[in-house]
Amino acid sequence: MPIFRPKHQKLILQCYPPGKGVDKKPNPSELSYLLYYASTRRVKLEKVVTFLDRKTTSDAKHNRAGNLQVTLTIISSLIEECSENLNVFASFVCSILKSVLQSKDLSLCKHAIQTYGVLCSKLDGGLFSGDKVFVDSFGSLSQNLINIGSENSKKRGPNNLEWQMISLMTCRYISNCLGYNSKFSKKFIEICIPILTETVHANNKQSNLLTILKSNVNIEDENHHLGRIASTKTNQTSRKAQQDLDNDAVKDSDLNEEALRGLKALFSTSLTSQISEATRAIVKNNYATTIDPIWGCTFLEMCTTWIPVQLRFITLSTVLSSLTSLSNKSTKKTSNYPIQLLYANYCLGLVSSDVNMIGLSISDVIQQILFLQANLLLSQSHYFQEEDVKKLSMIYSNCICNLSTHIYYFDQVPDSIREILIKVVSILENSVISGNANSSGVYRFIITLLEDISIIFDLLQTKPSNISRNHVSLEDWDLSLILLSSEIGLNPTKDQKPLFSYEQITDIQFKYLRVFGYFLNNELVTRNENMETGAINSIESFNVGGDHLQPDYNNYISDPGNFIAHFLGYVDKFFSGQSLINIDNASLLQKVLKNMILILGINFINNFVPFFFYWQLPLNPNLVDDNTRIKDTLGYTLIYHSLIKMDKIYELNYVRESEFFNSLLGDINYRKLNKLWVNGLQSKEEDAVLDNHHALGHRDENGTLRFNPTKKNLEDFVIGNAFTLSWINPHRPLILDIVNNYIPKKENNQNVLSDMSDESSIIENSSYHTSARQNGFGLGLGNANDISSIHSGLLFHQSQNVNMKNAFSNGNETSNGSIYTSDRQYNTPRVSDLKDSVLMKKKPGVAFNEHYNSDTTPGSILSKQMVTSDIDSILEGLDIDDDSEIIV
């Protein structure tokens, strides 16, 4: 033994009490002086730890357990006191700890894990980024600590649980260092997750996890509140577990608590990469160990609750990203179905739980899930088993429904519905354009998404959110109205086989009408709104905002391109197919339209008027087929229902006594007597009412067939009441070409009326039948009563709606003067309109627009200066019958 020693060696040796005892502690006064000495200069600190490293090697070799205990205490104190200079001696600390572990003594290893915990708490990113030697040494030390605990815990002995506790504590301590080096982080997350998961799985049933999950989520209900009591209990449990380890009295409950704390340390971080790696490791381990999927879902949800609330969405994004990658790589040889199913279940668990995810992009997530579902039904279904496809598709649908109804922001539900409808239309469009032969997959996809929408609305009713939300509007459905068409899946630009069969088209129409009808009664209006009994007493009461019964609500009257007009245009296309209309679909369509009458009132009626005249039976009996009879019956049923409900809703007490209404009833009875009426569309009660009227006035004294409800009848009806005069325009134009190709041109109808004896009757009705009977060319925009309103809004609606054209439009068809017409030659009035205007000494539209504005649109012919005397001489020379056909 040397007689003379350097000062730092003397100070160190003085800390060791004499004797060969196992449980030693450093002399407190000598230790204090040593710490002071080491903290004064970095050189002194380096000398101290260098000597301690050599002494530890010697003590471990000679099995001096008591001295090793003292050394570990000195090292812990140095780390605490000199943490700002930890980079000077961190590598020596790792070397000392590895020397201690070689003894494989439980008491020394328990002390070593405490020192390791102090070291991990003081490390920073500088050492991990600039000292590769330290990173390797620290990684080796951490691996040794985990292994020594795991290996000894599997051996039969009295201290298995204590050894397992050392591994679990290492996993918790190392979590503080995972954010400093990505490679290091990934390696040890993959090592720690299986150890922690196995311990939790061995000690917790799913019910236990649900209890922890509920406690973490902190659901605010009357049965549970998380407060100081729960927090205090957690701290007490932590201290008890440490005491049990020191006293060799570790229990399974201590291991469980330590594993949960380790998982919490892994996930309670602001590092997105660490959250993603931990999420992947959990799913990968659960798949490899065949853990019950339900237990695994709850386990992942529980871990997610420990993530800062603004970063929880990363877990869901990670699961979806991995699932998308697996879906894209899936082939017939390597389908990856089991792992896809597992990831899909975890995704469902996250979106359907009470775990809030602030910052989650709902639209993006729904798009991802819709992509996965489309890929499943259109591609993977070729090599997956049918039952597997159904199971996975159901999970995707449940994800969409639960995510859409877990409200995070005001417009979430409308955004979700729009995303679904956009996906439906885009898949349909791409399939038609590309000639995709997988019609069954596309059909199945459309039906599935429509069912998803129905479930979303049902969930919103049965489980309403406490968070205020916006409701889905009618306009959100505009893009999807193509599903009403009987020509859905048909590309008019190509001579190819239709995408869908008649049965598939019928099913799509039926499903769409069912979902839309449910939307009308449960989302657009609430359940407690009774449109039939909630009559509105006066026009002044319409000032209440948001009331769909309010005249011109959302410009449903003043805007010719409104949703109601679009919907009715597609209803017309519903009847345009070559096959016989399904009577059940027609009946369901009528119910939907009746609901629209109850909800929209005068707004619907005003838009429906031109369609009523257009849907009447052709006067040529040779052109009457089953579809035209159904359409005619639907038109008469709706106009009857409209008049009755208008009288009741707005308390007019006017309709039933009017000549138009009685003429309408007579016309209906005429159809019944002549077997032109289609039974089964209207209710039995309506049939009973209609059967009480007689057919009168359908033939004049010369025996000429006449239809009573004419435009003149409607004009007289409108003028007879202030409310109808203000809000019903009997001259509203029939706009069939909502977009080119939306409504097909009828054929072989050019001379339907040529044999009729009453030419004035022909002229009187032609404005409502022009598109079908004369191909709709050269008829301008309307007549004197609507020309003003159309001119004032035409340019605005052209620019606003030009992008809403049908996805299947070829753009080559000439417009008949629709609101989307871009050619200025059609934006002109008829001679008959100008004649009425000049002769009555007023501009068009005054009679039917009490809010008429005298200002005209720039460029309008109505703004030009006219010499009335010359105009009079010209107009008087024109025949009445020619007026309506001539365009200025």
Curated annotation (Swiss-Prot):
One of the protein's GO biological processes:
protein localization to plasma membrane
**Xref: Pfam families:** EFR3 (PF21072)
Provide one Gene Ontology cellular component. Answer: plasma membrane
Q: Gene name on record?
A: EFR3
Family annotation (PANTHER family): PROTEIN EFR3
Q: Which InterPro entries match?
A: EFR3, EFR3_HEAT-like_rpt
User: What protein family does this chain belong to?
Assistant: Belongs to the EFR3 family.
Q: What superkingdom does the record give?
A: Eukaryota
| Protein name as annotated | Protein EFR3
